C-alpha cells in the first residue's frame, strides 16, 4: 500500500531525530496534496506537529484558488497553514529558476522563524527521471546525474519521501479517496523541455536525447581506474568492454523509463559508496576556510583525488566564498583545473571570486567587480550581508548600516588598523581580503570592522560570523 511505502521512506530518511514538529510544502497539485494527506497520517501516529506552507508565485490566476484550497484542507486536518508570496518584480528572465530559489528562500526562512528543522517536498519518481534526462542533455558528470532524497537549503533539511513512488500511484490514491487537486496549466506547455520529456514518458515512449554531442568527456580518460570504471557506468565507452545495455541505448540516444530509473540507482550507489566519501575526505584534508571569508586549497593533497571530485571541490569553494546559490558550469571550472596541472602561479576570476595560485596552495577570495554588495541597515539585532556574513549588534546603535570598505575610507583609517593577523593568514593578501569584509558605518563614518577588532569608540560591540547560505546535495556547510 502507498502509505506503508511512504511511512518506510520517511522513517528511514528522518531517522531518530526526535522531532516534535515538521513542515511540508504544498502547492495544490496532485503530488503535494497526496503528500499532505500521507504526512498528516504519519504525523498523527508519531505525535508530531505538522505545518503546511504554500507559496503563491503571482503568475497564474488559479494560484489564489489553490492556496485557498490548501488552507481549507489544512483547517480540516487541524494543521497550521502559512501562505507566502513570491514577488517576481515583473522580471520574467530565467523565471523558473528564480521562482524556485525564491520559493525555497521564503519557506526555509519561515522554518527558521518557527524553529523547524525539516521541510518535506513532493518530488516523486517521475521528477527524478525527468531531472536525469535534463542533466544528461546538459552533459552533466556523475555528480550532476545523481539524485538525493535529502538536501540542505538555508540550514533546513529538505526531505523527499516520495522519491520511489510514481505520480500515477499518487493520483490513484487521491481518486480512491475522492480528494480534489489542481492541474497547473503550464505543465502542458511545450515551451519547457521538461514538459516534453514528461509527456513522452507518460505515454510509455522511450526518452530520446535532445542532442547528438558525444557525452564521454576526454579529460576523464586519464583518471584513476576506479573513477573511470565508475564513470563508464553512467557514460558509455565501448572501448572498455563494460558498456551496459543502458549505455548502448544511451549511445543511440534512446532510453526507456525503466532503464533511466535503473541507471539513476546505479549512479546514486556510486556517489554514495565511492565519490561522496572521497569528496568529504578531500574537503577535510585539502580545504581550509577562514572566518574572513576566504579559503586555501592544498594542491599537493588535492592532486590525489579524482577529476569529478576536483570539480566538486572547486565549486564547493566558489559557492561558499562568492555567496552565490548556484554552482559554476563545468566548462568554466575546467580551465582552472588545467592551470593547476601546469604548476605555475596564476590569478584568475571566476564566479564572483579571485582564484590565485601561491606555490602549492590555491587562495580563493571574494571579488566584487562591478556589482558591489548591497548595503544593509541594521534595524534588527542581526542582518545577513552579501549572503555570507551574519552581523549582530549587541547594543542600540542608531542609523548604522553594513557595507564594504571603500578605498577612500581605507586611506582615512589605514594607520589605525591592525592587519598583521589577517596578513599572516592570507599570505600577504590582506589588503584585497580587507576590502571584501563587512564594515559598519554611521552616515559616512566607519565605526567598526569587527573582523579585525577595529572600533572608533569603546561603546560599540558587534559580532560577525561567516555564514554562507550554502546549498549542496553532497556536503553541508553550517
From Swiss-Prot:
Family matches, as InterPro entries: Rossmann-like_a/b/a_fold (IPR014729), RPE1 (IPR005728), TilS/TtcA_N (IPR011063), tRNA_Ile_lys_synt (IPR012094), tRNA_Ile_lys_synt_N (IPR012795)
GO biological process, one term: tRNA modification
Keyword Nucleotide-binding among record annotations: yes
A Gene Ontology term for the protein's cellular component: cytoplasm
Reactions performed catalytically: cytidine(34) in tRNA(Ile2) + L-lysine + ATP = lysidine(34) in tRNA(Ile2) + AMP + diphosphate + H(+)
GO terms assigned for molecular function: ATP binding; tRNA(Ile)-lysidine synthase activity
Pfam families assigned: ATP_bind_3
Source taxon at top rank: Bacteria
Major location (coarse): cytoplasm
Swiss-Prot/TrEMBL keywords: ATP-binding, Cytoplasm, Ligase, Nucleotide-binding, tRNA processing
Enzyme nomenclature, EC number: 6.3.4.19
UniProt-annotated location(s): Cytoplasm
Binding-site residues, ATP: 27-32
Record text about domains: The N-terminal region contains the highly conserved SGGXDS motif, predicted to be a P-loop motif involved in ATP binding.
Function noted in UniProt: Ligates lysine onto the cytidine present at position 34 of the AUA codon-specific tRNA(Ile) that contains the anticodon CAU, in an ATP-dependent manner. Cytidine is converted to lysidine, thus changing the amino acid specificity of the tRNA from methionine to isoleucine.
Similarity comment text for this entry: Belongs to the tRNA(Ile)-lysidine synthase family.
Protein name, UniProt field: tRNA(Ile)-lysidine synthase
Species this chain originates from: Rickettsia conorii (strain ATCC VR-613 / Malish 7)
Amino acid at each position: 500500500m502507498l502509505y506503508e511505502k511512504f511511512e518506510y521512506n520517511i522513517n528511514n530518511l528522518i531517522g531518530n531525530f526526535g522531532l516534535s514538529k515538521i513542515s511540508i510544502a504544498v502547492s495544490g497539485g496532485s503530488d503535494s496534496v497526496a503528500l499532505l494527506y500521507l504526512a498528516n497520517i504519519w504525523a498523527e501516529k508519531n505525535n508530531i506537529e505538522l505545518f503546511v506552507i504554500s507559496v503563491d508565485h503571482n503568475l497564474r490566476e488559479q494560484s489564489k484558488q489553490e492556496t485557498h484550497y490548501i488552507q481549507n484542507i489544512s483547517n480540516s486536518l487541524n494543521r497550521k497553514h502559512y501562505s507566502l508570496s513570491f514577488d517576481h518584480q515583473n522580471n520574467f528572465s530565467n523565471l523558473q529558476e528564480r521562482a524556485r530559489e525564491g520559493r525555497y528562500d521564503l519557506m526555509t526562512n519561515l522554518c527558521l522563524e518557527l524553529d523547524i528543522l525539516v521541510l518535506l517536498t513532493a518530488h516523486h519518481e517521475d521528477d527524478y527521471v525527468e531531472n536525469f534526462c535534463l542533466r544528461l542533455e546538459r552533459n552533466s558528470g556523475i555528480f550532476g546525474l545523481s539524485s538525493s532524497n535529502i538536501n540542505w537549503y538555508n540550514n533546513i533539511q529538505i526531505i523527499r519521501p516520495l522519491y520511489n513512488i510514481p505520480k500515477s500511484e499518487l493520483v490513484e490514491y487521491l481518486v480512491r479517496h475522492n480528494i480534489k487537486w489542481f492541474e497547473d496549466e503550464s505543465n502542458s506547455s511545450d515551451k519547457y523541455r521538461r514538459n516534453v520529456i514528461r509527456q513522452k514518458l507518460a505515454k510509455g515512449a522511450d526518452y530520446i536525447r535532445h542532442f547528438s554531442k558525444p557525452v564521454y568527456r576526454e579529460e576523464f580518460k586519464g583518471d584513476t581506474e576506479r573513477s573511470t570504471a565508475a564513470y563508464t557506468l553512467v557514460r558509455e565507452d565501448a572501448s572498455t568492454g563494460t558498456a551496459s545495455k543502458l549505455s548502448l541505448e544511451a549511445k543511440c540516444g534512446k532510453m526507456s523509463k525503466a532503464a533511466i530509473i535503473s541507471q539513476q540507482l546505479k549512479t546514486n550507489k556510486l556517489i554514495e559508496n565511492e565519490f561522496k566519501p572521497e569528496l568529504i575526505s578531500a574537503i577535510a584534508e585539502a580545504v581550509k576556510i577562514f572566518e574572513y571569508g576566504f579559503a586555501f586549497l592544498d594542491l599537493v593533497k588535492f592532486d590525489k583525488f579524482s577529476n569529478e571530485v576536483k570539480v566538486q571541490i572547486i565549486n564547493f569553494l566558489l559557492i561558499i566564498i562568492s555567496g552565490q546559490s548556484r554552482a559554476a558550469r563545468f566548462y568554466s571550472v575546467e580551465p582552472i583545473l588545467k592551470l593547476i596541472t601546469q604548476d605555475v602561479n596564476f590569478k584568475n576570476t571566476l564566479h564572483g571570486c579571485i582564484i590565485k595560485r601561491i606555490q602549492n596552495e590555491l587562495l580563493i577570495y571574494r571579488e566584487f567587480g562591478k556589482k558591489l554588495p548591497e548595503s544593509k541597515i541594521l534595524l534588527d539585532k542581526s542582518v545577513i550581508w552579501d549572503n555570507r556574513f551574519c552581523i549582530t549588534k549587541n547594543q542600540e546603535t542608531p542609523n548604522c548600516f553594513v557595507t564594504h570598505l571603500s578605498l577612500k575610507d581605507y586611506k582615512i583609517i589605514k594607520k589605525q588598523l591592525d592587519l598583521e593577523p589577517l596578513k599572516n593568514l592570507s599570505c600577504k593578501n590582506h589588503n584585497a581580503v580587507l576590502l571584501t569584509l563587512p564594515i559598519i558605518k554611521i552616515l559616512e563614518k566607519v565605526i567598526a570592522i569587527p573582523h579585525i577588532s577595529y572600533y572608533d569608540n569603546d561603546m560599540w560591540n558587534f559580532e560577525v560570523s561567516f555564514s554562507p547560505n550554502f546549498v549542496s546535495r553532497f556536503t553541508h556547510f553550517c
